[in-house]
Amino acid sequence: CLDGRTGELIWFYQLTHHGLWDYDPPSAPILGDIAVNGRVVKTVTQLTKQGMSFVFDRITGEPVWPIEERPVPQSEVPGEQSSPTQPFPSLPPPYLSQGYHEEDLLDFTPELRAEALAIAAQYVTGPMYTPPTPVREGGTQGTWVNPGYQGGANWNGAAFDPQNGMMFVPLRNAPMAASLLEPDPARTDWNYLRAPSVFIQGPRGLPIMRPPWSLVTATDMNIGQHIWSRSIGPASDYIRHHPDLQGLDLDFDNMGHPMIRPFTAAADFTITVSG
């Protein structure tokens, strides 16, 4: 927070310590007045790619709800010193699953499930903030990062309704790989280079995760609780007509398109996709 008249720093908060995952704040912070325990608080909310929402008193910089520093996995890369902890807001709860969990993987059929597990086994997996790892020949191909660098929440930000204190947050559900490569020593003395960021693809061209692949969550910011969550639109035509999914009893209309699309959220909780 800066004083716009003088440029003076008023307060600040570091959302990710020693960032190794491209988890920079993806969108502009959102201003809004909410009522917490009967007291009006002028807030500023920052959504993150990690699928979290940091809410501060925009005058003082104090968190509206406690933010806990939790231990996180440490880097095993020689010379790297990752942060021992990362901040986790107590409220609102995370918008998406964080880190690696087998139950999140695609499970339309036993065969697709087995292939998804085999793909996941190619990566170093663990809780969110597991550090990037080198690509090993015949071994793991980097670290499973979930939510991926494109969210969680991302550039699209969110919408705040000042009449009722509701925040509507569009989200994407897709992991990515954080991989390190050993460079040519004739060209650099660096130990490792960051590999290009890629989505972790699922079996047979399908997403690696169970749907919904995009969704919107409505959060009552007065109490820091999610009220409802809905998928954003149907699955893509490619998924709907995928040969391995024909004849299965699947709800294609509520899987959420792999790419977030424009939508309108109505008071009755219905979602209308407009593009």
Residue ranges, per PLM feature:
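Beta-sheet-rich non-transmembrane sensory/scaffold domains
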Residues: C1-G275
